[in-house]
Amino acid sequence: MPAADPAIVLVRHATLVLELGDERVVVDPMLDPAGAREAVAGSPEPRPNPLVELPAGADALLEGLTAAIVTHLHADHLDAAGARFLAQGAIPVQGQPEDLATLAEQGIDAVALGAAPLGTLPVQRTGGRHGVGALADRLGPVSGAVLAYADERIYVAGDTVRSAEFDEALHVHAPTTVVLNAGGARLLEGEPITMTAGEVATIARDHPDTLFIAVHMDAINHCLDTRAVLRAELERARATNVLVPEDGERVVLD
């Protein structure tokens, strides 16, 4: 029986399931129920997080997983429920080298991102900048990952603004599909710390032959660029190579 077409499922926010042949890789499992955590401090939007529940059918989406990637340890990427899920030890986990000790303290036996294949999938770690200047330094290291499957090269960029590290990853790996953490996350001080709607549109127009999938919106209080804001900007910029999935939506890479 031939393998199903490769696909990327947005669970919620930055939580993804990459369906690549026999592998099903979860990225950044944020699994807390709505309102379980306080709002991100220093944001103009005070609502508790997550802003929305997991989508209907989320439990089924998280069945049959073969591996996990944790791009960094901020709570909107690995929360208490997500850590408990990974600590069950049912699947291998890869994370940033800087995070391995903390993951171990949470009962998660992880290896460095890119140190080994994820099952049958080659994976390489990429860098990024979680903002600009001193604020990015304070927020700490972030990573992305490039996975290869058949003719697809999938770049999960992680929590980065457009930066030298991001542009280098596009140049070196020439991905066919890029997942961008959008939302224009921002605090009361400094510049946005994830991709803004304008950045997504500009990047897409700079790379017209690449498919971009924008996630990281409408679920966490400091992500102020909503899906509606992004879609309006993409229409204004005539950027037609960006998909903006809803929670629970599967994007087939054909």
Task: Identify the role of each PLM range.
Residues D32-A34, H74-L78, L100-T102, A116-G119, ...:
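Active-site environment of divalent metal-dependent phosphoester hydrolases
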Residues V161-D247:
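Cap/insert and terminal regions of metallo-dependent hydrolase folds
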Residues M1-A3, G89, Q94-E152, A232-D254:
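Metallo-beta-lactamase
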